[in-house]
């Protein structure tokens, strides 16, 4: 250490405090990185790695660097690669310091603490999430530093906590240090993957410390006053976030002024699987917004409105009063196109006030950010005027809650020029007339420059040297330049400063005096402008809570207007939402499928579900007929209604549901080492554990991932359980290829059979996509295979095998006669192992599966003939 230069010793001391971050060490106009940081950063950033001898032992030290004025994209790239970046600035003026300049880390940028606009998706939140597992509860707190959005809740299980993680989709997760090795992150590696996991010392979660952190940050007397007093685990999760901010953000975070505590029971609960299966935020296939419900409904014109819409979709309401408040507002906007378009036009020029407010509070806002804030505020009076006649409760409340922030608008308008430069420390920011001393200095600067022009003309006249020039450069300042051929004509008061090849440069006492005056004024102008800008920014930051409230109201208004615009264009209707137990939809349509296929008429369908005769609807029919689309559309219509949106239907009445479960599709979970069938069974188990009579359950092809008999058995048992178990007798749509399940309608009084209508013509099948009562008579699998393009030879052979199976023709050993031949010495095929201990042969299984009470005499004779041929 003693052999290192003072600068490198300083670097290593600071680096020791931030071992897990890449240290951006400010040296003049560059951020330098050294040693391992340099090696890692040069690889990620694809910049040159060099070396320099910084010590007395002759060892080279790896280094790389980036310009400080364009560091943002480099920082963003490192953070995107999962790195933390510690920004170390010079906190003293190098000109006024002898020796080493004092440096400090002013902030640490992590994936969950990004505030730079260019690094953030405008309509996506960037959350830092904190998990704290208690003995019987989990605390979940999450913060978007860029907007100040801070929320906390508690769950009663680890699964529910991780479901919140999936919904929030944070960039970074905080957990207690004790969980670093095989702890909470290892419980759900699929959800932890792709996110930075950061660990916090155990003492931070101490109850007294947590309480003190919350009280001090929010300036309240107790945690109860902050909104999370009844959430012990939630309080500790919040404290971890606040502690992490203290460690990483040295500036003020006053825009984080409100903590929203909520109970998951306040919203319609959607687990991770259901959110994915319904494609709420992104499609299953490519993960894009287009093709998702969010992609369809998002006609918001502001970034903050887009973020709020996503929150509404992922957290639908269960309060009938709040749902109908939203529906009233949407209805008013749908009914008056001029009103709706006027509101949307007024909002269209509003910038992202939430993120502007965040940058202002964190002292990272530019002058252009302040101008953008003012440009947004000047639109508010006309917007409020538009809202004056609003009759719905919610629109009126939003109108009355919008703060014009006239004082903020006036301050920025008076203090900042309309088109300021990007760079803050080069002047040109503060408006003329805002500050008298600045105006005087500018006058001196302008007059001084005019004096130089007059001096040049004066000296040309005095010396008779027409080529004489008065110029300036940063090395010599102002000077008079005379060519060597004219040196004999210079006056005696010229003082030589520099000799060139063809000319010489001089100064005069008068020129030197004005140089000091002019240059002193320009330096003072830049210094004073920056100080005045900081003062304006701080005064605006002091109004951060007012700005945040207005931003929230504008975002809500934007969402309502967007939902109204979609409803108008797509002929959606207002649903009736009440406390009843029925879901009745007439002429329902899948919102996304309909929108993406405008050239083809969507076949609308009706549905009735309730806790009476229509509790469990068994839907049979071939693949591609539309079963999955129908079931998803029912779930989406319910979700849209409880979001406060109009719905794609001719008429809809929705009894509020508490949860929506979907078990649709098949996929392995390789990260958790689970097969398709295991994923299916785990999701089904979660439904049976958590469903209530208020829930909506959508099940598609339960049991298809195993053998036929096992699959039928599981599907049948699941259906019976949902019907017979009072605790979880949810309204259920149950699609299946197992036609045996249609028998449930005979033995269970709340089961109803439906199928997807199909028309056969010339050995072809036409899917009518209409849901009709009754069970399907055929599966049409071979016809679907033909439509998919299988070779005709395969189709014909499939028909032959199907015929043998249906006629019960069996070969030796009870195996269906499907093989055309058997090679000599071939081993006898082994049947697929069952999940259950089955000792019965095929004959016994067939007999055991008969419902004798439901057979007609003719059906009984036919089955007896079939059994005789099997013996």
Curated annotation (Swiss-Prot):
<dbReference type="InterPro" id="IPR027417">
    <property type="entry name" value="P-loop_NTPase"/>
</dbReference>
<dbReference type="InterPro" id="IPR007696">
    <property type="entry name" value="DNA_mismatch_repair_MutS_core"/>
</dbReference>
<dbReference type="GO" id="GO:0003684">
    <property type="term" value="F:damaged DNA binding"/>
</dbReference>
<dbReference type="Pfam" id="PF05188">
    <property type="entry name" value="MutS_II"/>
</dbReference>
<feature type="binding site">
    <location>
        <begin position="621"/>
        <end position="628"/>
    </location>
    <ligand>
        <name>ATP</name>
    </ligand>
</feature>
<dbReference type="InterPro" id="IPR036678">
    <property type="entry name" value="MutS_con_dom_sf"/>
</dbReference>
<dbReference type="InterPro" id="IPR045076">
    <property type="entry name" value="MutS"/>
</dbReference>
<dbReference type="GO" id="GO:0005524">
    <property type="term" value="F:ATP binding"/>
</dbReference>
<dbReference type="InterPro" id="IPR007695">
    <property type="entry name" value="DNA_mismatch_repair_MutS-lik_N"/>
</dbReference>
<keyword id="KW-0547">Nucleotide-binding</keyword>
<dbReference type="Pfam" id="PF01624">
    <property type="entry name" value="MutS_I"/>
</dbReference>
<dbReference type="InterPro" id="IPR007860">
    <property type="entry name" value="DNA_mmatch_repair_MutS_con_dom"/>
</dbReference>
<keyword id="KW-0067">ATP-binding</keyword>
<dbReference type="InterPro" id="IPR005748">
    <property type="entry name" value="DNA_mismatch_repair_MutS"/>
</dbReference>
<dbReference type="InterPro" id="IPR036187">
    <property type="entry name" value="DNA_mismatch_repair_MutS_sf"/>
</dbReference>
<dbReference type="GO" id="GO:0030983">
    <property type="term" value="F:mismatched DNA binding"/>
</dbReference>
<dbReference type="Pfam" id="PF05192">
    <property type="entry name" value="MutS_III"/>
</dbReference>
<dbReference type="InterPro" id="IPR000432">
    <property type="entry name" value="DNA_mismatch_repair_MutS_C"/>
</dbReference>
<comment type="similarity">
    <text>Belongs to the DNA mismatch repair MutS family.</text>
</comment>
<dbReference type="GO" id="GO:0005829">
    <property type="term" value="C:cytosol"/>
</dbReference>
<keyword id="KW-0234">DNA repair</keyword>
<protein>
    <recommendedName>
        <fullName>DNA mismatch repair protein MutS</fullName>
    </recommendedName>
</protein>
<comment type="function">
    <text>This protein is involved in the repair of mismatches in DNA. It is possible that it carries out the mismatch recognition step. This protein has a weak ATPase activity.</text>
</comment>
<keyword id="KW-0238">DNA-binding</keyword>
<dbReference type="InterPro" id="IPR017261">
    <property type="entry name" value="DNA_mismatch_repair_MutS/MSH"/>
</dbReference>
<keyword id="KW-0227">DNA damage</keyword>
<dbReference type="InterPro" id="IPR007861">
    <property type="entry name" value="DNA_mismatch_repair_MutS_clamp"/>
</dbReference>
<dbReference type="Pfam" id="PF05190">
    <property type="entry name" value="MutS_IV"/>
</dbReference>
<dbReference type="Pfam" id="PF00488">
    <property type="entry name" value="MutS_V"/>
</dbReference>
<dbReference type="GO" id="GO:0006298">
    <property type="term" value="P:mismatch repair"/>
</dbReference>
<dbReference type="GO" id="GO:0140664">
    <property type="term" value="F:ATP-dependent DNA damage sensor activity"/>
</dbReference>
<dbReference type="InterPro" id="IPR016151">
    <property type="entry name" value="DNA_mismatch_repair_MutS_N"/>
</dbReference>
């Amino acid at each position: 250490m003693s052999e290192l230069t003072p600068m490198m010793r300083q670097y290593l001391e600071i680096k020791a405090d931030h071992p897990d971050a890449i240290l951006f060490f400010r040296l003049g106009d560059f951020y330098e990185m050294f040693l391992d940081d340099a090696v890692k950063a040069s690889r990620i950033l694809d910049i040159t790695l060099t070396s320099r001898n910084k010590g007395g032992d002759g060892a080279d030290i790896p280094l790389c660097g980036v310009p400080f004025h364009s560091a943002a994209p480099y920082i963003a790239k490192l953070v995107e690669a999962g790195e933390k970046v510690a920004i170390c600035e010079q906190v003293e003026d190098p000109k006024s310091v002898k020796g080493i300049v004092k440096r400090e880390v002013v902030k640490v940028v992590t994936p969950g603490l990004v505030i730079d606009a260019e690094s953030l998706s405008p309509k996506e939140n960037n959350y830092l999430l904190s998990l704290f597992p208690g003995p019987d509860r989990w605390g979940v707190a999450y913060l978007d530093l860029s907007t100040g959005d801070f929320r906390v809740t508690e769950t009663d299980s680890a699964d529910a906590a991780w479901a919140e993680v999936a919904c929030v989709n944070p960039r970074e997760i905080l957990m207690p240090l004790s969980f670093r090795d095989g702890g909470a992150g290892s419980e759900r590696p699929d959800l932890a993957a792709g996110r930075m996991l950061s660990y916090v010392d155990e003492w931070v979660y101490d109850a007294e410390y947590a309480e003190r952190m919350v009280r001090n940050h929010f300036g309240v007397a107790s945690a109860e006053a902050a909104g999370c007093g009844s959430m012990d685990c939630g309080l500790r999760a919040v404290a971890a976030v606040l502690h992490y901010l203290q460690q990483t953000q040295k500036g003020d975070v006053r825009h984080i002024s409100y903590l929203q505590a909520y109970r998951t029971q306040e919203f319609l609960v959607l687990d991770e699987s259901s959110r994915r299966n319904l494609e709420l935020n992104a499609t299953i296939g490519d993960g894009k917004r287009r093709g998702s419900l969010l992609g369809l409904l998002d006609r918001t014109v502001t970034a903050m409105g887009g973020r709020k819409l996503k929150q509404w979709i992922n957290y639908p309401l269960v309060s009938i009063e709040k749902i109908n408040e939203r529906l009233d507002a949407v209805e008013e906007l749908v009914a008056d196109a001029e009103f709706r378009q006027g509101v949307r036009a007024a909002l269209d020029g509003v910038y992202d006030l939430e993120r502007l407010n965040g940058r202002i509070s964190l002292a990272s806002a530019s002058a252009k950010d302040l101008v953008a804030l003012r440009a947004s505020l000047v639109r508010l009076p006309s917007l409020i005027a538009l809202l004056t006649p609003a009759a719905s409760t919610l629109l009126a409340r939003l109108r009355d809650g919008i703060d014009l922030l006239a004082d903020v608008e006036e301050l920025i308008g008076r203090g900042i020029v309309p088109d300021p430069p990007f760079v803050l420390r080069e002047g040109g920011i503060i408006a003329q007339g805002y500050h008298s001393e600045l105006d005087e200095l500018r006058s001196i600067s302008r007059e001084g420059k005019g004096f130089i022009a007059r001096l040049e003309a004066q000296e040309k006249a005095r010396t008779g040297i027409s080529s004489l020039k008065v110029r300036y450069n940063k090395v010599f300042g102002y000077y008079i330049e005379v060519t060597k051929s004219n040196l004999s004509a210079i006056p005696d008061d010229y003082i030589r400063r520099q000799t060139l090849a063809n000319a010489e440069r001089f100064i005069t006492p008068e020129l030197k005096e004005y140089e000091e005056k002019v240059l002193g004024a320009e330096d003072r102008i830049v210094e004073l402008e920056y100080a005045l800008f900081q003062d304006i920014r701080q005064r605006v930051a002091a109004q951060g809570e007012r700005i945040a409230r207005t931003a929230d109201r504008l975002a809500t208004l934007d969402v309502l207007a967007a939902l109204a615009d979609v409803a108008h264009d797509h002929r959606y209707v207002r649903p009736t939402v009440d406390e009843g137990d029925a879901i009745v939809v007439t002429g329902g349509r899948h919102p996304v499928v309909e929108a993406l296929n405008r050239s083809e008429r969507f076949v609308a369908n009706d549905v009735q579900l309730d806790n009476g005769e229509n509790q469990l609807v068994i839907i049979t029919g071939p693949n591609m007929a539309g079963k999955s689309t129908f079931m998803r559309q029912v779930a989406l219509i319910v979700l849209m209604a409880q979001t406060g949106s109009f719905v794609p239907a001719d008429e809809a009445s929705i009894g509020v549901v508490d949860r929506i479960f979907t078990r649709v599709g098949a996929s392995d979970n390789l990260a958790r080492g689970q097969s398709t069938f295991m994923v299916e069974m785990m999701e089904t188990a979660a439904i049976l554990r958590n469903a209530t009579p208020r829930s909506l359950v959508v099940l598609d092809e339960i049991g298809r991932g195993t053998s036929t008999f096992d699959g039928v058995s599981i599907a049948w048992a699941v259906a019976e359980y949902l019907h017979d178990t009072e605790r979880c007798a949810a309204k259920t749509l149950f699609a299946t290829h197992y036609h045996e399940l249609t028998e449930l309608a005979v033995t269970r009084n709340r089961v109803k059979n439906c199928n997807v209508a199909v028309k056969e013509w010339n050995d072809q099948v036409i899917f009518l996509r209409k849901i009709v009562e009754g069970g399907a008579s055929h599966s049409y699998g071979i016809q679907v295979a033909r439509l998919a393009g299988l070779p005709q030879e395969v189709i014909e052979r499939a028909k032959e095998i199907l015929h043998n199976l249906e006629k019960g023709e069996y070969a030796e050993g009870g195996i269906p006669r499907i093989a055309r031949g058997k090679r000599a010495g071939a081993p006898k095929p082994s049947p697929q192992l069952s999940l259950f201990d089955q000792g019965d042969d095929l004959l016994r299984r067939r007999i055991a599966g008969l419902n004798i009470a439901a057979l007609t005499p003719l059906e009984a004779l036919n089955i007896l003939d079939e059994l005789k041929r099997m013996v």
